[in-house]
Structure formats: C-alpha cells, structure tokens
C-alpha cells in the first residue's frame, strides 16, 4: 500500500494521513523528518545534505530521492508507506519513478481555495493554553476572547489570509501539475488515482478511502 497524497495546504491531508497510517499500519514519510534523521545518524547522504544546508542552499532533488529510496527500503515500509508533501514537482516525480520507487495509489484532496481560506483564516488561538477556536465552526462564547481565561485570542502567522493565499498560489504553480502527471500514470496502469471531495465530513472521507483502498 504505497500512497502519495496530493492537495493544497488546509485540504485535510494530515487528518486522513493519520487515519490511513492507523488503518493500514504504514508509516508516513516526511522529507523534513528524513533529512533530520539522516543528519543525526551521520549517514553519507546525511552528511552531504548537512553540508548543503550549512552553506544555506536547498537540498537537491537527487539527494532527497536518495533519502526516500533509503527510507522506503527499511523494515517498517514492507507493507507500504505514505508520502505527504513529496513529490512536489514533476522533476521529483520523474526522478522517483526512474529510481524505482513504486506508487500504488495517488489520492488528491480537492477543496476550493475559498473554502481553505475560510478554514484557515477563521482560526483563532489562545496562546497560553493552545486552545483553538474557529469563527464559523467553533466560535468562542465572547468574540475574540478565550472561553476559560477571558484572554485575547490571536491569529497564527500561518493562518493570516494573505499567507494562506500565497501558499495556495505556490501550490497551484508548483504542485498542481502533478495531478496531470499522476492521472497520466493511472491511465497507463502504473497506479490508481482517486480525487476526493475534501469538503465532506472527516468520517465520510474515512469510509470512502476504506472502500476504495480495500
């Protein structure tokens, strides 16, 4: 069960990733976690990555692919794995394919931009406790105030509307082309491709994924 998740930030991939990991007993592979682990372990690729990062440069696709290949060969990936946030670009997807990393299912979580903006820009947090509210879905009893302490609520920088829209623009420019890439792969029989309406209730999406991936 080798899965790639696609979808804009705020489309609900993280929630479903947790569900899929628990259901199928597969690990989630994050390139950031992999880089940190490889550097800590002092592996050859880790040392190369550290040198690049220490010089303030971006880690190359070749290095990342090497790390992914190393990671998916580990024991806990025997039953499969879940890739979220990678590949991000067509060259990365091509390089993955060329290096023999097989993908069984590509799941695209489709949510309109305006819904994502509402979801994320509507969040308010109480910095002292970490309590999270939402102007639409879970509003505080008193506008702008924490229910328990009465302190002012704030907006996380990542949830500012301008930031959300900027991240969405980057997603559409860089990652959206992967939809075409993997749909073409599915047509050729290399993998299955499933588009999921991410505006549905979490439980409904859980059921849909269980049925489709059974």
UniProtKB/Swiss-Prot annotation:
Which InterPro entries does this one have? Adenyl_kin_sub (IPR006259), Adenylat/UMP-CMP_kin (IPR000850), Adenylat_kinase_CS (IPR033690), Adenylate_kinase_lid-dom (IPR007862), P-loop_NTPase (IPR027417)
List the subcellular locations: Cytoplasm
Q: What is the native source organism of this protein?
A: Colwellia psychrerythraea (strain 34H / ATCC BAA-681) (Vibrio psychroerythus)
UniProt EC number: 2.7.4.3
Give the reactions, separated by semicolons, that this protein catalyses. AMP + ATP = 2 ADP
Listed binding positions for AMP are 31, 36, 57-59, 85-88, 92, 156, 167
Tell me which Gene Ontology terms the entry assigns under biological process: AMP salvage
Q: Which residues bind ATP?
A: 10-15, 123, 132-133, 200
- The disulfide bonds in this chain are none
Q: Pull one GO CC term from this UniProt entry.
A: cytoplasm
Write down the NCBIfam families for this protein, in alphabetical order.
adk, PRK00279.1-1, PRK00279.1-2, PRK00279.1-3, PRK14527.1
Supply the alphabetized keyword list. Answer: ATP-binding, Cytoplasm, Kinase, Nucleotide biosynthesis, Nucleotide-binding, Transferase
| One Pfam family in the UniProt entry | ADK_lid
Q: What is this protein called?
A: Adenylate kinase
Family, according to the entry, reads as follows: Belongs to the adenylate kinase family.
Describe which pathway this protein belongs to, using the record's wording: Purine metabolism; AMP biosynthesis via salvage pathway; AMP from ADP: step 1/1
At the top of the EC hierarchy, this enzyme's class is transferase
């Amino acid at each position: 069960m080798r899965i790639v998740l696609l979808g804009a930030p705020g489309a609900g991939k993280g929630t479903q990733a947790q569900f899929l990991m628990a259901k199928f007993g597969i690990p989630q592979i994050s390139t950031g976690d992999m880089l940190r682990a490889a550097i800590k372990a002092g592996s050859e690729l880790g040392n190369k990555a550290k040198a690049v990062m220490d010089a303030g440069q971006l880690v190359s696709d070749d290095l990342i692919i090497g790390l992914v290949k190393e990671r998916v060969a580990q024991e806990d990936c025997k039953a499969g794995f879940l890739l979220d946030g990678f590949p991000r670009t067509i060259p990365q997807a091509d390089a993955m394919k060329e290096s023999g990393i097989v993908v069984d299912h590509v799941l695209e979580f489709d949510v309109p931009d305006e819904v994502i903006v509402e979801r994320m820009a509507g969040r308010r947090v109480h910095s002292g406790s970490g309590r999270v509210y939402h102007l639409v879905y879970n509003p505080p009893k008193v506008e702008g105030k924490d229910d328990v302490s009465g302190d002012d609520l704030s907006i996380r920088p990542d949830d500012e509307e301008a930031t959300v829209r900027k991240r969405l623009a980057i997603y559409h420019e860089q990652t959206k082309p992967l939809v075409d890439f993997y749909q073409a792969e599915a047509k050729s029989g290399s993998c299955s491709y499933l588009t999921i309406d991410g505006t549905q209730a979490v439980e409904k999406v859980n059921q849909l994924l269980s049925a489709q991936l059974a």
